Curated annotation (Swiss-Prot):
Protein's name in the database: Conotoxin S4.3
Keywords in alphabetical order: Disulfide bond, Gamma-carboxyglutamic acid, Glycoprotein, Hydroxylation, Ion channel impairing toxin, Neurotoxin, Pyrrolidone carboxylic acid, Secreted, Toxin
Domains (record comment): The cysteine framework is IV (CC-C-C-C-C).
Sequence similarity: Belongs to the conotoxin A superfamily.
Length: 34
């Protein structure tokens, strides 16, 4: 692994393995969506 890179197909930046997530999730800059 490297640093906080948006691994959309592998791991959600170490949060949820095998889960797709936007790059903003890595840098914690995602706008609140409900």
């Amino acid at each position: 692994q490297k640093e906080l890179v948006p691994s959309k197909t592998t791991t959600c930046c170490g949060y949820s393995p095998g889960t797709m997530c936007p790059s903003c999730m890595c840098t914690n800059t995602c706008p609140p969506q409900k």
